Amino acid sequence: MSATLALTEQLIARASVTPDDQHCQQLMTERLAALGFECETIASHGVTNLWAVKRGADGRDGKLLAFAGHTDVVPTGPLEQWTSPPFVPTHRDGKLYGRGAADMKTSLAAFVVASEEFVAAHPGHRGAIAFLITSDEEGPATDGTVKVVELLETRGERVDYCIVGEPTSSAELGDVVKNGRRGSMSGELVVKGVQGHIAYPHLAKNPIHLLAPALAELAAEQWDAGNEYFPPTTWQVSNLHAGTGATNVIPGHADLMFNFRFSTASTVEGLQARVHAILGKHGLEYTLKWSVSGLPFLTPRGDLSNALENAIRAETGLTTELSTTGGTSDGRFIARICPQVIEFGPPNGSIHKIDEHIDVRFVDPLKNVYRRVLEQLIA
């Protein structure tokens, strides 16, 4: 069994359902400390974070390449629906099954072993390697990567390149990498009316009727046209509620929850202003609470994307696609301190599902791609 596969199995065997790390980071720290990494545990409200750095011959003047990832996994769902226990690494038909196999314990193991091989082959490497690992990516993400980034900001730590080990591939390892992500902003809208008997509408004020024209306009609005890297911004309703459940009562308020997934073609302030303008045009009496969970980020073509594309091509023969599709990731926090952030990991077809798995034939090639990137950028 390869070193990468063995470490992957050890990590899967630890039931690290968010935010419980279950000592996964301790296992990684033992391996990294043996290589000369300075390892720091940063705990926050039940979340475990790791910042580990190995400086190169150039010291703090050298380029720093960080790997960012998470040890936490989503809950298993009904255990009886799993073909094998989710925290017992199991091989069937050339695949390794277990919660976290694809998202993202294979990536964690692959970069640890890639670092071991790189340091052994290049003991005098010039640049620095770092690991930024959290147990709060699958949860609220309020005490994980964002806390470490804030700490690094206060220290003036410079990160030149960052690979996030999210499962970005589609059908084959390396066919897709993410060089950016859309931002995410949610709104909680309460439209006020006047409750009353449904037979006497002149004595009441129906907030559903008041909201409907504005809702139609918001749904039809083209917020932007996107750009060469991002599709157009989208606005979607996630929840709509009004009424008491009775059939003879006009409700006193209507509650709407919605979400923007927005590109670099729009801003938080611009989108908020346009929503308020539409609501105001319809004369609504309302309250609106905003929540921004992430800003869009984009890494243009540069040293990191070139190195990753070259490594994937050398290892797999594939020409990778740079993409910004999908949901948010911790890359949105890291982009605050790092100009080049790219996500790359194994295929994502089974993530968060019953019987999550990874094709074993991708495990060592993933490690090799990571090692090739290290060799190109910081050797």
From Swiss-Prot:
Zn(2+) 2 binds at residues 103, 138, 352. It is an enzyme of class 3 (hydrolase). Gene3D superfamilies: Zn peptidases. GO terms for molecular function: acetylornithine deacetylase activity; cobalt ion binding; succinyl-diaminopimelate desuccinylase activity; zinc ion binding. It holds the Pfam family M20_dimer. The keyword Zinc applies. The active site is at 72, 137 (proton acceptor). Zn(2+) 1 binds at residues 70, 103, 166. Pathway: Amino-acid biosynthesis; L-lysine biosynthesis via DAP pathway; LL-2,6-diaminopimelate from (S)-tetrahydrodipicolinate (succinylase route): step 3/3. Binds 2 Zn(2+) or Co(2+) ions per subunit. Keywords: Amino-acid biosynthesis, Cobalt, Diaminopimelate biosynthesis, Hydrolase, Lysine biosynthesis, Metal-binding, Zinc. Its cofactor is Zn(2+); Co(2+). GO terms for biological process: diaminopimelate biosynthetic process; L-arginine biosynthetic process; lysine biosynthetic process via diaminopimelate. Its EC number is 3.5.1.18. Disulfide bonds: none annotated. It catalyses: N-succinyl-(2S,6S)-2,6-diaminopimelate + H2O = (2S,6S)-2,6-diaminopimelate + succinate. Belongs to the peptidase M20A family. DapE subfamily. Catalyzes the hydrolysis of N-succinyl-L,L-diaminopimelic acid (SDAP), forming succinate and LL-2,6-diaminopimelate (DAP), an intermediate involved in the bacterial biosynthesis of lysine and meso-diaminopimelic acid, an essential component of bacterial cell walls. HAMAP family: DapE (MF_01690). Homodimer. NCBIfam families: dapE_proteo (TIGR01246), PRK13009.1 (NF009557). This is Succinyl-diaminopimelate desuccinylase. It comes from Burkholderia ambifaria (strain ATCC BAA-244 / DSM 16087 / CCUG 44356 / LMG 19182 / AMMD).
